[in-house]
């Protein structure tokens, strides 16, 4: 049991029982990929895999932190008086980053904490282990220091840590999906305005299967920033002809009028993906509300094809998973999720076919790629909570 391991590790390292236990989920995005930074709608939900913590407040200004995921690093110690980024401090830079941003915003944090964490999200798999950790830390500090941070502000704080302290140019989706997570609901989020709406995820006799390629992807040094630049360049071109502030403000029909202004064929395809994907999100949410799971699944498939052909962020591993998933009985739809270039895909599969699905897709993947994929049946959980 994870919580017992967490407690005993805390006692072994710090010589006392932790006062509190916490959990923060990871996330999957059901549809709406690579458009959070293009002003589009996304449709993520929190999952029951995530990051657990045991924590206690200290009486001095020292923080001590230990991760069961990085045991070789041992206990990492630092003071509230020096919260500068240090590469050797590894994962605890997320703790330091959250502390630094909160203190700079005027929140009163005058004591250190002892912390042990243990995550069961596969690292680098695109299930937002870093956002899960950020939202976990905000929750712990909010609880210990009675900071009254709203869920939306918590997400914005996490994004600020990611962008300004860690140095990853990510959007708001991951932190938002986790911070505002509610059981059995997905969140339709407009990344421009932060308008959001909860949509019950009624999947009937079907489950969401997460398929991990086990090919690590690193957001910062993948082609993520290259795609962002291609979209930003295209937007700059289009702004000369139409009054928009983001690509996803255009419909496919409107884009037809202006598409010849974008001379680079790669950039043109990136625009086609962003604009069509935004429309797919709206159609998918409508389908879900009308209980049309078949259409929802078809839109997932179309999303993957667009990410493969127009946005070019899938790669052999993700394509092997998705394309083999489409052939299986009982499958409504399948697509990559997250930034791509490795990481995970998801499928919606009829419960009666889940075992067969995992066996067949797993075998096809191993035959094609040479190593195994991992499969998880996902449940949609709550946002960060004290246990």
From Swiss-Prot:
Q: Which residues bind Mg(2+)?
A: 130, 162
Compartments (UniProt record) = Cytoplasm
- Has keyword Transferase? yes
Q: Could you mention a single GO BP entry for this protein? A: galactose metabolic process
Annotated residues that bind ATP are located at 67, 124-130
Q: What is its EC number?
A: 2.7.1.6
Q: List the disulfide bonds.
A: none
> Which keywords annotate this record?
ATP-binding, Carbohydrate metabolism, Cytoplasm, Galactose metabolism, Kinase, Magnesium, Metal-binding, Nucleotide-binding, Transferase
Q: Where is this site: Transition state stabilizer?
A: 27
Q: Name one GO molecular function term.
A: magnesium ion binding
* Record's catalysed reaction(s): alpha-D-galactose + ATP = alpha-D-galactose 1-phosphate + ADP + H(+)
Work out whether the entry's keyword set contains Transcription.
no
Family, as annotated: Belongs to the GHMP kinase family. GalK subfamily.
Give the protein's function. Catalyzes the transfer of the gamma-phosphate of ATP to D-galactose to form alpha-D-galactose-1-phosphate (Gal-1-P).
Name of the protein in its database record: Galactokinase
This protein's species is Clostridium perfringens (strain ATCC 13124 / DSM 756 / JCM 1290 / NCIMB 6125 / NCTC 8237 / Type A)
Q: Which gene encodes it?
A: galK
């Amino acid at each position: 049991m994870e919580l017992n391991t967490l407690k005993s590790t805390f006692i072994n390292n710090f010589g006392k029982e932790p006062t509190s236990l916490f959990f923060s989920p990871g996330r999957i995005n059901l549809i709406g990929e690579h458009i959070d930074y293009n002003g589009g709608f996304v449709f993520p939900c929190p999952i029951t895999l995530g990051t657990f913590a045991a924590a206690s407040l200290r009486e001095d200004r020292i923080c001590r932190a230990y991760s069961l995921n990085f045991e070789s690093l041992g206990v990492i110690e630092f003071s509230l008086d020096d919260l500068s980024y240090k590469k050797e401090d590894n994962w605890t830079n997320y703790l330091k980053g959250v502390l630094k941003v909160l203190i700079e915003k005027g929140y009163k944090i005058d004591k250190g904490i002892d912390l042990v964490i243990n995550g069961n999200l596969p690292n680098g798999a695109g299930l937002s282990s870093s956002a899960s950790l950020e939202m976990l830390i905000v929750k712990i500090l909010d609880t210990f220091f009675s900071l009254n941070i709203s869920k939306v502000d918590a997400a914005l704080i996490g994004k600020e840590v990611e962008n300004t302290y860690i140095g990853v140019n990510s959007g708001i989706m991951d932190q938002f999906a986790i911070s505002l997570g509610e059981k059995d609901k997905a969140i339709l989020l407009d990344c421009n305005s932060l308008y959001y709406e909860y949509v019950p995820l009624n999947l009937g006799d079907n489950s969401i299967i997460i398929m991990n390629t086990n090919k690590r992807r690193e957001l910062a040094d993948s082609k993520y920033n290259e795609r962002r630049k291609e979209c930003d360049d295209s937007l700059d071109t289009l702004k000369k002809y139409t009054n928009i502030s983001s690509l996803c403000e255009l419909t496919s029909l409107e884009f037809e009028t202006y598409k010849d202004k974008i001379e680079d064929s790669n950039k043109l395809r990136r625009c086609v993906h962003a604009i069509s994907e935004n429309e797919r999100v709206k159609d998918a949410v409508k389908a879900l509300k009308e209980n049309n799971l078949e259409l929802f699944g078809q839109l997932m498939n179309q999303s993957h094809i667009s990410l493969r052909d127009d946005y070019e962020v899938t790669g052999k591993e993700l394509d092997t998973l998705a394309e083999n998933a489409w052939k299986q009985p009982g499958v409504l739809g399948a697509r990559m999720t997250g930034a791509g270039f490795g990481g995970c895909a998801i499928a919606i599969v009829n419960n009666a076919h889940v075992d067969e699905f995992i066996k067949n897709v797993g075998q096809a993947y191993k035959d094609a790629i040479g190593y195994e994929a991992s499969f998880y049946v996902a449940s949609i959980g709550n946002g960060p909570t004290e246990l």
